[in-house]
């Protein structure tokens, strides 16, 4: 008799939708740990700007896939997938199911749909050369060698741009052509959280991040890794850098961060509706609805 397939529950949604709080409530009720699927929370020292679960929250419920690397040592999608699958395999032997929580669409897809990114190791010499050229030039080079990846990668996203170029110059093949799908042998339950007042939630959370010390956190990252750290170009940190340099006031930085976060949330919503098929939870009774759906699957 074959062993039943393990169950993996996913809670996905755009940034600031309330995933972390709901996930902790769910995890407490069904007695499982949480695997965070957030591309920036993988890095040490990036706590406030990424709204990483607090120490208190991590003490309440065990969290995995946090603080895997230093910010100056980018993790590839292949490395993340390997780490996450190994962690889930260990969880399946101890808990009733795996529980993935996050809003990083490509990272989620690598696990839930079995997206297999190329296993090309980091090429530090190439990366240094690409950084010397600058993001604008690199993105134009990408347009010529991998138009498909160029269309999908934001002109501001230096990490993914450099990775795509790294794969091309290392293998002679585009990162787009090397990605394949190998669905995992799991039963999957995807739950979605997308509150109607998301813009208000984003505005409120952005103010809180700055109040909690985002500028000091950014100063610490600059001190340790230098102001050219690519992750300092991401939402929140880039705006904090402008305050540190005296280019913008805190009020202006908060306003710009809010705008960029809203734009990002819009992209997340589009991705989730095209790439996933979750059961969208009613925001008024999301916990009860989630537990009911989970119970129907667990039995």
Swiss-Prot record:
InterPro entries: Dimethylallyltransferase (IPR039657), IPT (IPR018022), P-loop_NTPase (IPR027417). Disulfide bonds: none annotated. Keywords: ATP-binding, Magnesium, Nucleotide-binding, Transferase, tRNA processing. GO terms for molecular function: ATP binding; tRNA dimethylallyltransferase activity. Its EC number is 2.5.1.75. Its cofactor is Mg(2+). The record marks 104 as: Interaction with substrate tRNA. GO terms for biological process: tRNA modification. It comes from the Bacteria. ATP binds at residues 13-20. It is an enzyme of class 2 (transferase). Residues 38-41 are annotated as: Interaction with substrate tRNA. Substrate binds at residues 15-20. SUPFAM superfamilies: P-loop containing nucleoside triphosphate hydrolases (SSF52540). It catalyses: adenosine(37) in tRNA + dimethylallyl diphosphate = N(6)-dimethylallyladenosine(37) in tRNA + diphosphate. Monomer. PANTHER family: TRNA DIMETHYLALLYLTRANSFERASE. Catalyzes the transfer of a dimethylallyl group onto the adenine at position 37 in tRNAs that read codons beginning with uridine, leading to the formation of N6-(dimethylallyl)adenosine (i(6)A). Belongs to the IPP transferase family. This is tRNA dimethylallyltransferase. It comes from Prochlorococcus marinus (strain SARG / CCMP1375 / SS120). The gene is miaA.
């Amino acid at each position: 008799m074959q062993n039943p397939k393990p169950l993996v529950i996913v809670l996905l949604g755009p940034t600031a939708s309330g995933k972390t709080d709901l996930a902790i409530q769910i995890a407490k009720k069904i007695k499982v740990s949480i695997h965070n699927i957030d591309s920036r929370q993988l890095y040490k020292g990036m706590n406030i700007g990424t709204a990483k679960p607090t120490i208190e929250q991590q003490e309440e419920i065990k969290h995995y896939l946090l603080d895997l690397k230093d910010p100056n040592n980018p993790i590839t999608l292949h490395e993340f997938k390997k780490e996450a699958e190994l962690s889930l395999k260990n969880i399946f032997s101890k808990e009733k199911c795996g529980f993935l929580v996050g809003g990083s669409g490509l990272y989620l897809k690598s696990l839930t749909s079995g997206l297999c990114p190329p296993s090309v190791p980091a090429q530090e010499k190439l990366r240094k050369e690409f950084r010397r050229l600058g993001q604008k030039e690199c993105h134009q080079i990408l347009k010529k060698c991998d138009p498909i990846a160029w269309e999908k990668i934001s002109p501001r996203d230096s990490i993914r741009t450099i990775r795509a170029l790294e794969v091309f110059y290392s293998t002679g093949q585009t990162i787009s052509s090397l990605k394949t799908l190998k669905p995992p042998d799991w039963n999957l339950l995807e739950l979605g959280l997308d509150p109607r007042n998301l813009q208000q939630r984003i505005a409120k959370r952005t103010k809180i991040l700055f109040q909690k010390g985002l500028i000091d956190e950014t100063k610490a990252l600059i001190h340790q890794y230098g102001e050219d750290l690519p992750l300092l170009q991401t939402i929140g940190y880039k705006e904090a850098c402008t305050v540190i340099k005296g280019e913008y006031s805190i009020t202006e930085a908060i306003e710009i961060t809010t705008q960029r976060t809203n734009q990002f949330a819009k992209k997340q919503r589009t991705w989730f509706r095209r790439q996933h098929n979750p059961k969208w939870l009613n925001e008024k009774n999301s916990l009860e609805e989630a537990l009911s759906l989970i119970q129907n699957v667990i039995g």
